């Protein structure tokens, strides 16, 4: 199954969770914080402006992004994988390099 987000929404595959702290302590799955990074796997057509024009999104498939800890509250399971669906304005930055 493939998701096609509408308008200014994007679908993100969350990065793998860290299971160790910086000090080397192994965290159980329930204590590990979910990462706020991921890769965009699908984008919508763009934001519809008040005048009816469509503004293309500033992100594209394959971009690695950072989002807020409470962003992407819409999680969808596709082919056994949890994907996040969020609006483009919930993305804080694109990771370059």
Curated annotation (Swiss-Prot):
Disulfide bridges in this chain: none
SUPFAM superfamilies on file: GroES-like
Alphabetically ordered keywords of this record: Chaperone, Cytoplasm
Superkingdom assignment: Bacteria
Subcellular location: Cytoplasm
Entry-linked InterPro entries: Chaperonin_GroES, Chaperonin_GroES_sf, Chaprnonin_Cpn10_CS, GroES-like_sf
GO CC term, one of those recorded: cytoplasm
A GO BP annotation: chaperone cofactor-dependent protein refolding
Pfam family, one: Cpn10
Molecular function per GO: ATP binding; metal ion binding; protein folding chaperone; protein-folding chaperone binding; unfolded protein binding
Membership in a protein family: Belongs to the GroES chaperonin family.
Record-linked HAMAP family: CH10
Record function comment: Together with the chaperonin GroEL, plays an essential role in assisting protein folding. The GroEL-GroES system forms a nano-cage that allows encapsulation of the non-native substrate proteins and provides a physical environment optimized to promote and accelerate protein folding. GroES binds to the apical surface of the GroEL ring, thereby capping the opening of the GroEL channel.
Subunit structure, interactors included: Heptamer of 7 subunits arranged in a ring. Interacts with the chaperonin GroEL.
Name of protein: Co-chaperonin GroES
Species for this entry: Pseudomonas putida
Biological classification of the source: Bacteria, Pseudomonadati, Pseudomonadota, Gammaproteobacteria, Pseudomonadales
Gene that produces this protein: groES
